[in-house]
Regions:
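N-terminal active-site segment of His-dependent metallophosphoesterases
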Residues: 1-54, 67-74, 145-147, 171
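Non-DNA-binding regulatory cores of transcription-related proteins
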Residues: 99-109
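Active-site environment of divalent metal-dependent phosphoester hydrolases
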Residues: 11-15, 40-44, 66-72, 93-98, ...
């Protein structure tokens, strides 16, 4: 079983991002961690600490609408086990309106999982045999608010996802 963690939208809250990531990554072995934008400088500030603490962890970042000053891509594709992933912030795909443009991107990439942020609203939706996962904002709103998303990929490439709350990781 492979494990992917997605977080998003730190908006300058570097310590909160660090606390969330270390708590969530410390729960179980993780293969990939993805930051979905709007705080890429925060990501850069903690990147080496995370890489040192979790050797072998693959770390990815995409830029959001508030990250124009960084050189990260708007959208990335990667594979975890037998599952194809795409990841973006979502502002260029109009995710605050609907997921239509992101669906087209996911179908084109033959993705089983599409990760996005931007809305600050945690959600997991299944369209066209693809999981569309928004982890919400790491800022959270109360102890039961989602701060991350966990995506599991089994040996056959089947995927499942859930949200992890601040309360669950003691934050």
């Amino acid at each position: 079983m492979k494990r992917v963690i997605a977080v998003s939208d730190s908006h300058g809250r570097v310590e909160r991002l660090r606390d969330v990531l270390f708590a969530v990554l410390g729960m179980a072995h993780t293969d990939v961690a993805v930051f979905l934008g709007d705080g890429c400088r925060d990501w850069d500030d903690i990147y080496m600490d995370v890489a040192r603490a979790f050797p072998g962890l693959h770390l990815y970042c995409v830029k959001g609408n508030n990250d124009s000053y960084v050189s990260y891509s708007d959208l990335i594709q990667f594979k975890v086990g037998a599952a194809n992933f795409i990841a973006c912030h979502g502002h260029r795909h109009g995710v605050k309106m609907n997921l239509d443009r992101l669906e087209i991107e996911a179908v084109s990439a033959e993705a089983q999982v599409a990760l996005y942020g931007h809305t600050h609203i945690a959600s997991i939706t299944n369209y066209f045999n693809c999981l569309f996962v928004n982890p919400g904002s790491i800022a959270g709103w109360g102890s039961f608010a989602p701060v991350a998303a966990e995506i599991l990929v089994d040996d056959k490439g089947q995927v499942s996802a859930r949200h992890i709350t601040a309360d669950e990781v003691g934050l």
